């Protein structure tokens, strides 16, 4: 049994989010929640919400036992970039890109 949860267009770069995703891949759900609760990174808060959603999906839709669930797969893909300008000297402007990412998490036995 595999249950997934997805989150699209998160305002965080995929590179920074993958650092947190690597911490919880393959861990049990309880252990993953503890790791995410004590991680100081912004991505930890976001991934924790996705993990809690996947746990709720497994419990509600499949009637799964939470104690046996593991994070079977988690991957972070690059999303669309928000193009913005920042002011520079002499009336010029430089383009900056605000990165987004898509998080896909799967829990199972």
UniProtKB/Swiss-Prot annotation:
Q: GO terms for biological process?
A: translation
Q: State the superkingdom.
A: Bacteria
Q: Which UniProt keywords apply?
A: Ribonucleoprotein, Ribosomal protein, RNA-binding, rRNA-binding
Q: GO CC annotation: what is one?
A: cytosolic large ribosomal subunit
Keyword rRNA-binding carried by entry:
yes
The molecular function terms in GO held by this entry are:
rRNA binding; structural constituent of ribosome
Instruction: Name the PROSITE patterns for this protein.
Output: RIBOSOMAL_L22
Q: What InterPro entries does the database record attribute to this sequence?
A: Ribosomal_uL22 (IPR001063), Ribosomal_uL22_bac/chlpt-type (IPR005727), Ribosomal_uL22_bac/org-type (IPR047867), Ribosomal_uL22_CS (IPR018260), Ribosomal_uL22_sf (IPR036394)
A Pfam family recorded for this sequence: Ribosomal_L22
Disulfide-linked positions: none
Family designation: Belongs to the universal ribosomal protein uL22 family.
What this chain does, per the entry, is described as: This protein binds specifically to 23S rRNA; its binding is stimulated by other ribosomal proteins, e.g. L4, L17, and L20. It is important during the early stages of 50S assembly. It makes multiple contacts with different domains of the 23S rRNA in the assembled 50S subunit and ribosome.
**Could you describe the subunit structure of this protein?**
Part of the 50S ribosomal subunit.
Q: What is this protein called?
A: Large ribosomal subunit protein uL22
The taxonomy runs: Bacteria, Pseudomonadati, Pseudomonadota, Betaproteobacteria, Neisseriales
Per the record, the gene is rplV
């Amino acid at each position: 049994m595999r249950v997934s949860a997805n989150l699209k267009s998160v305002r965080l770069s995929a590179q920074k989010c993958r650092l947190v995703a690597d911490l919880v891949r393959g861990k049990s759900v309880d252990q993953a929640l503890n790791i995410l609760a004590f991680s100081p990174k912004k991505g930890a808060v976001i991934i924790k919400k996705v993990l809690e959603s996947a746990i709720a999906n497994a419990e509600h839709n499949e009637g799964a036992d939470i104690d046996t669930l593991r994070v079977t797969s988690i991957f972070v893909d690059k999303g669309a970039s928000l193009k913005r300008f920042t002011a520079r000297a002499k009336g010029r402007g430089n383009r900056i890109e605000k990165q987004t990412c898509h998080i896909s998490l799967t829990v199972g036995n």
